């Protein structure tokens, strides 16, 4: 278990939870997360997860992602954002002999704009961000519609969304170069951009004043541009996490 993997998962879980209306200025917690990777013969990861959330008038922070509000009111929230993208591939971690001869794919820092618009029927959440560390040089656009239901201490937020990956993003994480093909025996592959729909559900229950338990899950149906890669043997990816937090 590396610190990078643990913290990166924390970002993913914070992002998946879709916390746009914070219920407190600052909260700390811990939990456990399960991540299903799309790569061939790649084990499901189970990680402990730190939870650190802060919501202010000008700044917000969740996991290893944060932002500065350019506009912030009850209806609309626009911010400059940066976050650590947890997507990665380590050749030595694959159980497939051919996959072990591929190059590693690194996780990276993404930066861009995020926007949320709230109505009585739910809210729109969208983020457009690009790689800042010259790894993939890719762009990712995520857009979702969510509805928050609250009953006493229970809050449930289902959502449906779609993620667009640029050609560079898919090329880096799912493409197979000529050199890799010659080394591994896998066929070369050059994907285009893609759209992948997803469903997500998050829930929290407040008990004993400032203590809460939470759970979140996301199911992503991978596009053909991803599933056609010889690196991939699944049609979906998934995330489940649960834990406990304390609000200050």
From Swiss-Prot:
Principal subcellular localization: membrane
Signal peptide: 1-22
Record's GO cellular component terms: cell outer membrane
InterPro entries: MipA (IPR010583)
One MF annotation (Gene Ontology) recorded for this entry: protein-macromolecule adaptor activity
Annotated compartments: Cell outer membrane
Record bears the keyword Signal: yes
This protein's UniProt keywords: Cell outer membrane, Membrane, Signal
A Pfam family matched in the record: MipA
Source taxon at top rank: Bacteria
UniProt-listed GO biological process terms: peptidoglycan biosynthetic process
Known function: May serve as a scaffold protein required for the formation of a complex with MrcB/PonB and MltA, this complex could play a role in enlargement and septation of the murein sacculus.
Quaternary structure, from the entry: Forms a trimeric complex with MrcB and MltA in vitro.
Family the UniProt entry places it in: Belongs to the MipA/OmpV family.
Protein name listed in UniProt: MltA-interacting protein
Species in which this protein is naturally found: Escherichia coli (strain K12)
Phylogenetic lineage: Bacteria, Pseudomonadati, Pseudomonadota, Gammaproteobacteria, Enterobacterales
